[in-house]
Amino acid sequence: MARILITSAIPYINGIKHLGNLVGSQLPADLYARYMRGRGHEVMFICATDEHGTPAELAAAKAGKPVEVYCAEMHEIQKEIAAGFRLSFDHFGRSSSARNHRLTQHFAGQLAENGFIEEVSERQVFSVADNRFLPDRYIEGTCPNCGYDKARGDQCENCTKQLDPTDLINPRSAISGSTDLEVRETKHLYLRQRALKDEIEAWIDSKTDWPVLTTSIAKKWLHDGEGLQDRGITRDLHWGVPVKKGDQPWPGMEGKVFYVWFDAPIEYIAGTAEWADANGKTEADWERWWRTDKGAGDVRYVQFMGKDNVPFHTLSFPATIMGSREPWKLVDYIKSFNYLNYDGGQFSTSQGRGVFMDQALSILPADYWRWWLLSHAPENSDSEFTWENFQASVNKDLADVLGNLVSRVTKFCRSKFGETVPAGGAFGEREHQLIAELQERLAAYESCMEAMEIRKAATELRALWVAGNEYLQSAAPWTVVKTDPERAQAMIRLSLNLIRLYAVISRPFIPDAAASTMASLGCDDWSWPTDVAAALERLPAGHAFTTPDVLFRKITDEERAEWQTRFAGVRT
């Protein structure tokens, strides 16, 4: 049994996330966590809300609430919606936790002690109208790289180029909209990433199995232009982790907080400690996941994130870990994603464009969305959500293929043999051919899941469903029963067991449908079907079941048109 540590990029607190956020981190991480648990491995799956920085302050101000109150409320909302999508976190924490405060300050102290922190006097934008320095995200303007007119002072969300506020064309305050800005001098702490470049580069070069997307972004940031740069890790904000050197004051840094991208990844570790606190565990229980000197040496650590988060996870966070000179666990594999676009444009939280997680759950259950998003995950290139494609995929894959098989088998059995698994005779050549095909396809599915090739895994899973449908169609028990009832019983016995097999292997993608199917079958044996032939004997003759309701209903043209119109505008 392996030990798998899984983290998803933690979502910003500034509002409910859209489907593009979901498919770029949390949902594929959940798929992998569920699969690994299903195979019997020990899994620790951690996520949290990212509560510090400019987005939190701006969103709270817009909502007319103190930032602490706003963050507490939004954490509960995001937690509830995540549960609605059946995201199976072992813990969903908060980057504003006391654990993360202490751990962030600890790392900063270690970095300073080891010579990897430098105090820098710099010129920063000051808003006369707002009477304050404006951190990166408090400044908006036109991107000098692509011309996008709502670029932020730290990064353009359109082209992903990292920026400094002074790079922006026609900059303005995100608080007041004022263009009355000045550049004044202030002091900040910088993480000396350049001093760690050789270590970081050697580490990245050792990751020969990483996706091309991850590696290419990391190496681009290492080598393009002037190469890896030192990074400011403090900000002039009111809300965040106060700057301390361990548990001691940091002279000259009074009133400042750590940059959100410094403390946010540390929450992966702190969140695991929060899990221990919440579940009556000891320090050793969480340290065995993170400290290589305390049991984490055999842990495989996998991160999931959108491509815009890759630079921070391949460079800045590893620099923090390495520079601490303490035995913390570094990531083994980073699964990164391109963007999911929406009907010809981009999903956007800040602009309210697209379908958001709460809206999605208000019109259809989670499994419909999980299946479409995962089977269209933007792995090798950007992908696009359209309502036509969504309708077609749900209707064909879920309703016509999987749902139809479950319905036909259970209803036919009920009408001819009652709601118990029939006995029948031995399996014939047709059944043995199916078993061989299923065994081969199951191996392909497992291989894709192990490799985190999500779209390919969905394709292989669908092929497994199709194989069962093709068998049922060619075996035609509804015809055979007229002349050879015992043979028809054997076919249905196999088919009922096949439904259980499908529930088990489909659970990572569609957990609710899997659970309801197993409940209808009166079965709680979720053991993985390593041996397909044995798995197809799991429900013995005489085992009682109940005919389930429709597993997946079809989306009508009228519904599709109505939703397309409803979500064509901007969420306010």
From Swiss-Prot:
BP GO terms, sorted: methionyl-tRNA aminoacylation
Free-text cofactor note: Binds 1 zinc ion per subunit.
EC number per UniProt: 6.1.1.10
Classification via InterPro entries: Anticodon_Met, Met-tRNA_ligase_1, Met-tRNA_synth, Methionyl/Leucyl_tRNA_Synth, MetRS_core, MetRS_Zn, Rossmann-like_a/b/a_fold, tRNAsynth_Ia_anticodon-bd
Listed GO MF terms: ATP binding; metal ion binding; methionine-tRNA ligase activity
Residue positions of motif 'KMSKS' region: 346-350
Record key words, sorted: Aminoacyl-tRNA synthetase, ATP-binding, Cytoplasm, Ligase, Metal-binding, Nucleotide-binding, Protein biosynthesis, Zinc
Sequence positions that bind ATP: 349
Domain of life: Bacteria
Main localization category: cytoplasm
Extent of motif 'HIGH' region: 11-21
Cell compartments where the protein resides: Cytoplasm
Catalytic activity: tRNA(Met) + L-methionine + ATP = L-methionyl-tRNA(Met) + AMP + diphosphate
Binding-site residues for Zn(2+), renumbered to this chain: 143, 146, 156, 159
Alphabetized SUPFAM superfamilies for the sequence: Anticodon-binding domain of a subclass of class I aminoacyl-tRNA synthetases, Methionyl-tRNA synthetase (MetRS), Zn-domain, Nucleotidylyl transferase
Keyword Protein biosynthesis tagged: yes
General function of this protein: Is required not only for elongation of protein synthesis but also for the initiation of all mRNA translation through initiator tRNA(fMet) aminoacylation.
Subunit description: Monomer.
UniProt cross-references to HAMAP family, sorted A to Z: Met_tRNA_synth_type1
Name of the protein: Methionine--tRNA ligase
Species, as recorded: Cereibacter sphaeroides (strain ATCC 17025 / ATH 2.4.3) (Rhodobacter sphaeroides)
